[in-house]
């Protein structure tokens, strides 16, 4: 039986009584962010807003982004990645469950040395794709060109952030490549694997 988003007590500094707020708002106050769904414009804008706001509260306290996502739209994912690079605080990324497709791109975007995977987490990388649709040939060519540009961006970032040669990353992105947490560490997507 679904119960909705759980509520937890929270006391604002200087107040005597506690208020009940949803658990995510409580965790946000501790700089703990969650990406637990498909990446689209809405969740991208929410995470970007939270990162920018929290970075204005403190430029030195790290942000923690917990990821359990099957991936999603490329441009909103790149927007999250770019914001992670832009904000002053380090963004620590934590893979719990699955970081696939754009989820793995965001995972690799965490501060190098501060990217972690839980021991049974899975990571998957592949090239960006678009759904086939019926269109004029000119539109199809333009979409293919845009996909090639996006693939080049993703490949360059993965290579830079993992330390792997561009050709290795490019070959890996030709198909869905699933990795265990330990394999993701060897691949350079995460720096540490948590121990239970």
UniProtKB/Swiss-Prot annotation:
Compartments annotated for it: namely: Plastid, Chloroplast stroma
Q: According to its UniProt record, where is this protein mainly located?
A: plastid
List keywords of the entry alphabetically.
Chloroplast, Hydrolase, Plastid, Protease, Serine protease
What Pfam families has UniProt attached to this entry? CLP_protease
- GO CC annotations on file: chloroplast stroma; endopeptidase Clp complex
Task: Give the reactions, separated by semicolons, that this protein catalyses.
Answer: Hydrolysis of proteins to small peptides in the presence of ATP and magnesium. alpha-casein is the usual test substrate. In the absence of ATP, only oligopeptides shorter than five residues are hydrolyzed (such as succinyl-Leu-Tyr-|-NHMec, and Leu-Tyr-Leu-|-Tyr-Trp, in which cleavage of the -Tyr-|-Leu- and -Tyr-|-Trp bonds also occurs)
Single biological process term from Gene Ontology: protein quality control for misfolded or incompletely synthesized proteins
Q: Does the keyword Plastid apply?
A: yes
Query: Which enzyme class?
Result: hydrolase
Keyword Chloroplast: yes or no? yes
Question: What GO molecular function annotation could you give as one example from this UniProt entry?
Answer: serine-type endopeptidase activity
Q: At the top level of its lineage, which domain of life is listed?
A: Eukaryota
Q: Which residues form the active site?
A: 101, 126
Q: What is its EC number?
A: 3.4.21.92
Do you know which InterPro entries this protein is assigned to? Answer: ClpP (IPR001907), ClpP/crotonase-like_dom_sf (IPR029045), ClpP/TepA (IPR023562), ClpP_His_AS (IPR033135), ClpP_Ser_AS (IPR018215)
Q: Describe its assembly.
A: Component of the chloroplastic Clp protease core complex.
Q: Give the family this protein belongs to, as stated in its UniProt record.
A: Belongs to the peptidase S14 family.
| Functional note | Cleaves peptides in various proteins in a process that requires ATP hydrolysis. Has a chymotrypsin-like activity. Plays a major role in the degradation of misfolded proteins.
Descriptive protein name: ATP-dependent Clp protease proteolytic subunit
* Encoding gene per record: clpP
């Amino acid at each position: 039986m679904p119960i909705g988003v759980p509520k937890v007590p929270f006391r604002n500094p200087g107040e005597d009584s506690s208020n009940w707020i949803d658990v995510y708002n409580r965790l946000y106050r501790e700089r703990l962010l969650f990406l637990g769904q498909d990446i689209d414009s809405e969740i991208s804008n929410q995470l970007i807003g939270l990162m920018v706001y929290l970075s204005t509260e403190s430029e030195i306290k790290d942000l923690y982004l917990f990821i359990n996502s099957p991936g999603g739209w490329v441009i909103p994912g790149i927007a999250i990645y770019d914001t992670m690079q832009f904000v002053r605080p380090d963004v620590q990324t934590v893979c719990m469950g699955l970081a696939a497709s754009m989820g793995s791109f965001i995972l690799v975007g965490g501060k190098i040395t501060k990217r972690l995977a839980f021991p049974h987490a899975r990571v998957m990388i592949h090239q960006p794709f678009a759904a086939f649709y019926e269109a004029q040939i000119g539109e199809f060519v333009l979409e293919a060109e845009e996909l090639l540009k996006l693939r080049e961006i993703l490949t360059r970032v993965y290579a830079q952030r993992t330390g792997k040669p561009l050709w290795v990353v490019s070959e890996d992105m030709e198909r869905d490549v699933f990795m265990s947490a330990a394999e993701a560490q060897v691949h350079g997507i995460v720096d540490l694997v948590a121990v239970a």
